[in-house]
Amino acid sequence: MPELPEVEVTRLGLLPHITGRRIVRAVVRHHGLRWPVDPALPELLAGLTVTRLLRRGKYLLIECVPEVEQSGRAADTVGGWLLIHLGMTGTLRVLETPVPPGLHDHVDIELAGATGVHVTLRYRDPRRFGAVLWHAGDEAGLAEHPLLRNLGIEPFDARFDGDWMFARTRGRRVAIKSALLAGDIVVGVGNIYCSESLFRAGIRPTTAAGRISRPRYAALADAIRATLADAIARGGSTLRDFVGSDGQSGYFQLEAFVYDRAGLPCRACGTPIRQIVQGQRSTFCCPTCQR
């Protein structure tokens, strides 16, 4: 499943290709994703211009606004946001030349630039666990969308630090890994990067969240940011289906300290990496380096 780094890599890859372009048309071939695609989406998008491409957690947010100076548009035309979640196998690709759609290519958005050159933003999702949703309105209203309003703080937000984590885990008996995956303390730290961050901080993933000290949370906050930044710089992790918007695979997984390295020697101390199961998810850790 694409995690925060993979979504951010996708955002950065799409940014120069779609911002400032006008949507010529949209084609929805399959409406049955995790949540149904609005049948009116092609009509809602036609003529709007992409002005911003943001990320909130694992959601891509594409701002689409009307060109008010354009003649012939209805006076009540409103802009809004596309909310896109890649699910487990979703990808977004920019096509600069026509490519016939495949079986799993569900949504195409054709965009025109100032020079008239068209590109196509194509959403592909073999397992259909992703989402392409429309939210009419401004950014303030978007923040209250049911899928976004309860998300935790962004890991690169200046407010996110050890004090933030310490204050929000007092009295919690749940294991720290499970607490991080819940997404209400900090958003976007999925299974891969959770194992990696806990290793970098030297914290055993089964430790109760409420028993971790303030200094150790400071180390964990730093480890989370460093791990995610490294993953973004390396193009994310390619475990099964993920590729960036240019079709290239990420390679963070090749340099992982613990993830998917069960039985192999720890890169720091040589102890065999241990694999356990927490909440039906595989966890990897070093029994010597993490305590």
Curated annotation (Swiss-Prot):
Its cofactor is Zn(2+). It catalyses: Hydrolysis of DNA containing ring-opened 7-methylguanine residues, releasing 2,6-diamino-4-hydroxy-5-(N-methyl)formamidopyrimidine; 2'-deoxyribonucleotide-(2'-deoxyribose 5'-phosphate)-2'-deoxyribonucleotide-DNA = a 3'-end 2'-deoxyribonucleotide-(2,3-dehydro-2,3-deoxyribose 5'-phosphate)-DNA + a 5'-end 5'-phospho-2'-deoxyribonucleoside-DNA + H(+). Binds 1 zinc ion per subunit. Its EC number is 3.2.2.23, 4.2.99.18. Keywords: DNA damage, DNA repair, DNA-binding, Glycosidase, Hydrolase, Lyase, Metal-binding, Multifunctional enzyme, Zinc, Zinc-finger. SUPFAM superfamilies: Glucocorticoid receptor-like (DNA-binding domain) (SSF57716), N-terminal domain of MutM-like DNA repair proteins (SSF81624), S13-like H2TH domain (SSF46946). A zinc finger (FPG-type) spans 257-291. The active site is at residues 2-3, 58, 281. InterPro entries: DNA_glyclase/AP_lyase_DNA-bd, Formamido-pyr_DNA_Glyclase, FPG_cat, MutM-like_N-ter, Ribosomal_uS13-like_H2TH, Znf_DNA_glyclase/AP_lyase, Znf_FPG/IleRS. One of its GO terms (biological process) is base-excision repair. One of its GO terms (molecular function) is zinc ion binding. It holds the Pfam family Fapy_DNA_glyco. Involved in base excision repair of DNA damaged by oxidation or by mutagenic agents. Acts as a DNA glycosylase that recognizes and removes damaged bases. Has a preference for oxidized purines, such as 7,8-dihydro-8-oxoguanine (8-oxoG). Has AP (apurinic/apyrimidinic) lyase activity and introduces nicks in the DNA strand. Cleaves the DNA backbone by beta-delta elimination to generate a single-strand break at the site of the removed base with both 3'- and 5'-phosphates. Monomer. Belongs to the FPG family. This is Formamidopyrimidine-DNA glycosylase. The lineage of its organism: Bacteria, Pseudomonadati, Pseudomonadota, Betaproteobacteria, Burkholderiales.
